């Protein structure tokens, strides 16, 4: 998993409440057995005027010129500012995969759906909860200043606005540790690889019949 330490990026606004996971990545794209390739279908039903199916060439489709991420001023955005209850709906982990693979590193909103919130951390995305008044201020500044960028310093737990003012935010210490070090669940487990190997060796030496039973099954 990619580390998150300090990130500076262009900000895009998603001015809708209750954006659910089916809007983030529609159900027809969940058929893939791979974990990659979802970025091109992020917000598919809003992003394109035609219906999308897995395997379609995005270049052959009709983009919706009114959708925010299709507007030239937000091309290459890596920070998304959203409204309350972002990521509600089903618990599909494909939603943070799609956001990450599109290029987003952080999402700022007044609130998130719980499962989506946790899935973001597990996939290298930083979801930040901010007061609604702060989110309103950011929406206003994004609209007023083309090319609006923010700097997010996870170690210091601050968001730095273009003028230099800092917005503090909270993050659970364990989640912060994982993002700073790039640890997903597998990475956390592999930190103890030596102990796991030692345990398996001891078990094989003291209870060899268990290994034999497993092989027979």
Curated annotation (Swiss-Prot):
One of its GO terms (cellular component) is 3-isopropylmalate dehydratase complex. The keyword Cell wall biogenesis/degradation does not apply. It comes from the Bacteria. Keywords: Amino-acid biosynthesis, Branched-chain amino acid biosynthesis, Leucine biosynthesis, Lyase. One of its GO terms (molecular function) is 3-isopropylmalate dehydratase activity. It catalyses: (2R,3S)-3-isopropylmalate = (2S)-2-isopropylmalate. Its EC number is 4.2.1.33. Belongs to the LeuD family. LeuD type 1 subfamily. Catalyzes the isomerization between 2-isopropylmalate and 3-isopropylmalate, via the formation of 2-isopropylmaleate. Heterodimer of LeuC and LeuD. This is 3-isopropylmalate dehydratase small subunit. The lineage of its organism: Bacteria, Pseudomonadati, Pseudomonadota, Betaproteobacteria, Burkholderiales.
């Amino acid at each position: 998993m990619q580390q998150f330490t300090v990130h500076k990026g262009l900000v895009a606004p998603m001015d809708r409440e209750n954006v659910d996971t089916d809007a983030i990545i529609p159900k027809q794209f969940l058929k893939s057995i791979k974990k990659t390739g979802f970025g091109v279908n992020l917000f598919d039903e809003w992003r394109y005027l035609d219906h999308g199916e897995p395997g379609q060439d995005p270049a052959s489709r009709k983009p919706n010129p009114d959708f925010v991420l299709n507007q030239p001023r937000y091309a290459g955005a890596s920070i998304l500012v959203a409204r309350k209850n972002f990521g509600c709906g089903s618990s599909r982990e494909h939603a943070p995969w799609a956001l990450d693979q599109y290029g987003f590193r952080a999402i700022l909103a007044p609130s998130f759906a719980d499962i989506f919130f946790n899935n973001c951390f597990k996939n290298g995305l930083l979801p930040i909860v901010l007061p609604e008044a702060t989110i309103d201020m950011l929406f206003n500044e994004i609209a007023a200043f083309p090319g609006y960028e923010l700097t997010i310093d996870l170690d210091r737990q601050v968001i730095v606005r273009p003028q230099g003012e800092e917005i503090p935010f909270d993050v659970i210490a364990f989640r912060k540790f994982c993002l700073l070090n790039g640890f997903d669940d597998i990475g956390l487990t592999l930190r103890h690889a030596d102990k796991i190997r030692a345990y398996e060796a001891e078990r094989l030496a003291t209870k060899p019949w268990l290994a034999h039973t497993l092989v027979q099954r």
